[in-house]
């Protein structure tokens, strides 16, 4: 049998990435999301919901809360309350959390890649093979800097709370680019995702 014949007769198994797992996750949340503030989801107000769509098909993925001014103020206040304790963990303590976050990204990378592709419209291959490994890598990298902060950056102090706006083109990767260094150095983050890629 030639190589060409082998390729022509190969039986392909199912891809390890499946939309079914992402759909179950969205259904468990009734495809509705409030704001995540202070470690908790806010109540959902139907008047402030907007629709997140799959740009490839126009399909509704979920309905999301558009934050009100009072919710933004609550998020900033929660971040300010949390920041002193986060800073007090020290670089090694913060690094443990960032390493754990990187490992969670790796553990759930297939699900996150499917969600990122559905939300953004980019090919799954790009999310899975490009974005997700870099997301984990950024958290690993900045965890290392957190461990070195005391000796390599003596006298540096956190600024407090960082407000970060994430664009639509690399939502999860941009989150890692912006949040990982801020968190590593002892800051807290209030994040505003793009309305087109909010999941």
What kind of feature is each model-predicted range?
Residues 37, 72, 76, 161, ...:
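Hydrophobic aliphatic residue packing
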Residues 144, 148-199:
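Conserved small-residue-rich beta-alpha loop and adjacent elements
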